[in-house]
Amino acid sequence: MKKIVYTLLMVLMFSGCANVETYNLKYADSGKTLKLALGDTVNVELPENPTTGYSWAFFTNPEPQNIITNITESYRQYNVAENMVGVGGIKIFSFKATHPGKVTVTGYYYRPWENMTESYVSKVVYNIVVKKPLTHQGE
């Protein structure tokens, strides 16, 4: 009985030690493959200037987006002199690995009121592989 209790305590102790990582992807990383563990986060940081009407939109293949989930979006304007108009910045998309599998994430920089496939001015593609958690032998 003591052996079972000890084993259970060890399993619980080490299962809480799994490291959750955060990765950052930039525009120049387009085309790369990133391997994630469940719970890991990836931040995609792309230049954007909303005053032009252009913005980034992301799509996944295959659908639905259950391998990774878009958890937040934010925008950070470049540091400039006060009261400057038309200044761009960085759009940050944060995704969390939620299920094992492979997914291709494609981002288009386009004007939402125009046909995306004909009017986009920039495109990024990231291949994401979410690894299955390790299991014990015999499971």
Please report, for each region that a protein language model flagged, where it lies by residue.
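Sec-dependent signal peptide recognition
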Residues: 2-7
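C-terminal motif of bacterial Sec signal peptides marking the signal peptidase cleavage site
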Residues: 15-16
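Extracytoplasmic/periplasmic copper-protein system
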Residues: 21-28, 114-139
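Short, solvent-exposed loop/linker segments at beta-strand-coil boundaries, enriched for Pro/Gly
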Residues: 52, 60-79
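Glycine-centered tight-turn and secondary-structure capping sites
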Residues: 95-105
